[in-house]
Amino acid sequence: MAYLAVLPEAGAAVAGSAAAHWLPVRVVGDGEAVLAFDHAQFVADGVARTQAKLEYTALATAFLPPQFTVNALRQVYETVWDTRLDRGNFHRAVADARKGFLTAVEGETVKARRFQAQLFRRRQGLEAAGLLDHPVRRS
């Protein structure tokens, strides 16, 4: 049995020995890091499950603080899916008032490059594991 945790930031690894430490998931997937027994398969299964859940749940918001920009959310999708997404199409998919799963935080912006970026939060009543009305597609 294996458990998958999704965190905005990982704390210090604590275990019974000094050998416990965090690794980027790519290092495990590429075979750079050797894990005992079939633990690499556990990681691969967890990554595949997370990639799939991003399409039909609000799970990506669990990687972020409560208020975030659409660009930060897109970076989560791009990182987990290991692919580039069109900025405009992505913004429409997640922030559209009829189809999206985000709510703009009124009057809240952050400086982003040369402009102010609107802050968003997950739609009220929608948990990270909650199903989306309209899926977010990888392509």
PLM segments and residue spans:
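Alpha-helix initiation/capping motif
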Residues: 32-35, 83, 109
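A conserved acidic, glycine/proline-rich C-terminal tail/linker
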Residues: 87-88, 105
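Short helix-coil junctions and helix-kink-helix linkers
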Residues: 76-84
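Long, intrinsically disordered, low-complexity Ser/Thr/Pro-rich regulatory/activation regions
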Residues: 102-139
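Conserved short-loop catalytic and cofactor-binding motifs
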Residues: 60-61, 78
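NUDIX/MutT-family hydrolases
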Residues: 1-55, 64-76, 89-95, 99, ...
